[in-house]
UniProtKB/Swiss-Prot annotation:
Mg(2+) 2 binds at E266, H269, D305, D307. It comes from Tetragenococcus halophilus (Pediococcus halophilus). GO terms for molecular function: magnesium ion binding; xylose isomerase activity. Coiled coil: none annotated. Mg(2+) 1 binds at E230, E266, D294, D337. This is Xylose isomerase. Its EC number is 5.3.1.5. It comes from the Bacteria. The keyword Cytoplasm applies.
Length: 435
């Protein structure tokens, strides 16, 4: 069955494209800074928002028109995989991501769930072998089921901790089976609702123990992915332990996990944490921990995770600048952790939304590459910190000064003269790269 029979394969047609099923900016084979655009961006489609959402919200029923529902949960699961790989083929997307519960019915027991995962990953592997599509990352959903009401690896219940371990073990087995390039941990329930009954230090110690078990098991099965922690400050838990990039890195460093873990950063999660997306990427870059991106955007007027498809060229440009400055995102990628709006309920909206996101990041990549070629930010930063490139500043950087010598220097000064940052002018110059 063709699920999108009225949608052609999406091709690059340029800014004057007449078809809505065309890329106007994403040209996969276009060479930018020495390699094809597709290799810079490494686009991935998220199974969960694409295939399992129905458009419902707390105030209304689902609106999405979908044609893959079967007569049994397993039939529906296989239909979804068929439709999903058709979407990947239409878009020319080379990667995908999923949670375990996205692809397999959970059944009535852990045993049945794990068996269903085996069946469905066999089915998915067949599709991968046929199409050449690759798994960017998979993860275990340990936040939806009532079992995880108090967390998974930070739970107060040792039985629940064991259930989480079993689910992640299967996730690692699956990732090896499908040759996943990364494995993600997002702790939606790893945090606390009320500090009055929480031993935070104990919970974080247990979380670190869990991650060490993950490292040990991966070595045992000779599987070496890039492990990624995905920060988010809140939602669904009031206070989540992986609040933002800096908090996650503090945890990683405290427990000596730097050799195994980097960060998967999401734009909307940055918004919820009170940061820009580029801030989070810059923090991760400075720790050498920029692992992968969830390319979406939030609504600055709302206080929750709206997971919109990215259309903000300004944010995409600054994000891609950080990626280029880091030397690239591989083995990570840009995963569209985004869902179509409730009013975008037609089947082809799934294709159109991904086209919009892919075009947006293609424009961001082009602009960021031009800025790198022009040394735009490099010159600005060099000028701002030039006092540390000679004289007393250079002496400070070379660790040749101390408090006493700097005091003597300060006393010899006849006042201090600061330079204007000209920030409005710099923003105006940045805008010139975006048109």
């Amino acid at each position: 069955m063709d699920y999108f029979e009225n949608v052609p394969k999406v091709q690059y047609e340029g800014k004057n494209a007449k078809s809505k099923y065309a890329f106007r900016h994403y040209n996969p084979e276009e060479i930018i800074m020495g390699k094809p655009m597709k290799d810079h961006l490494r686009f991935s489609v998220a199974f969960w928002h694409t295939m399992t959402e129905d458009g419902s919200d707390p105030f209304g029923d689902g609106t999405y028109q979908r044609n893959w529902e079967g007569s049994t949960p397993m039939e529906t699961a296989k239909n979804r995989v068929d439709a999903f790989f058709e979407i990947l083929e239409k878009l020319g997307a080379e990667y995908f991501c999923f949670h375990d519960v996205d692809i397999a019915p959970q059944g009535d027991s852990l045993k049945e769930f794990l068996e269903n995962i085996d069946v469905m990953t066999d089915y998915i592997k067949g599709k991968m072998d046929k199409t050449g599509v690759k798994l960017l990352w998979n993860t275990a959903n340990m936040f939806t089921h009532p079992t995880f009401v108090n967390g998974a690896a930070t739970t107060n219940n040792a039985d629940v901790y064991s259930m989480a371990a079993a689910q992640v073990k299967k996730g690692l087995d699956v990732s090896k089976k499908l040759n996943g390039e990364n494995y993600v941990f997002w702790g939606g329930r790893e945090g606390y609702e009320n500090l009055l009954n929480t031993d935070m230090n104990f919970e974080l110690d247990n979380l670190a123990r869990f991650y060490q078990m993950v490292i040990d098991y991966a070595q045992k099965i000779d599987y070496h992915p890039q492990f990624l922690i995905e920060p988010k400050p809140k939602e669904p838990t009031k206070h989540q332990y992986d609040y933002d990039a800096a908090t996650a890195m503090a945890f990683i460093q405290k427990y000596n996990l730097e050799d195994s873990f980097k960060l998967n950063l999401e734009a909307n999660h940055a918004t919820l944490a009170g940061h820009t997306f580029e801030h989070e990427l810059n923090v991760a870059k400075n720790y050498n921990a920029l692992g992968s991106l969830d390319a979406n955007q939030g609504d600055l007027l709302l206080g929750w995770d709206t997971d919109e498809f990215p259309t903000d060229i300004y944010t995409a440009t600054l994000a891609m600048y950080e990626v280029l400055d880091f030397g690239g995102i591989a083995p990570g990628g840009l995963n569209f952790d985004a869902k179509v709006r409730r009013t975008s309920f037609a089947m082809d909206d799934l294709i159109l939304a991904h086209i919009a996101g892919m075009d947006t990041y293609a424009r961001g990549l082009r602009a960021a590459a031009k800025m790198k070629d022009d040394n735009f930010f490099e010159q600005i930063i060099a000028n701002r910190y030039e006092s540390f490139s000679s004289g007393i500043g250079k002496q400070i950087v070379e660790n040749k000064e101390d408090l006493e010598s700097l005091t003597n220097y300060a006393l010899s000064l006849n006042g201090v003269e600061n330079k204007s940052g000209h920030i409005e002018h710099l923003k105006s110059l940045l805008n010139d790269y975006l048109v």
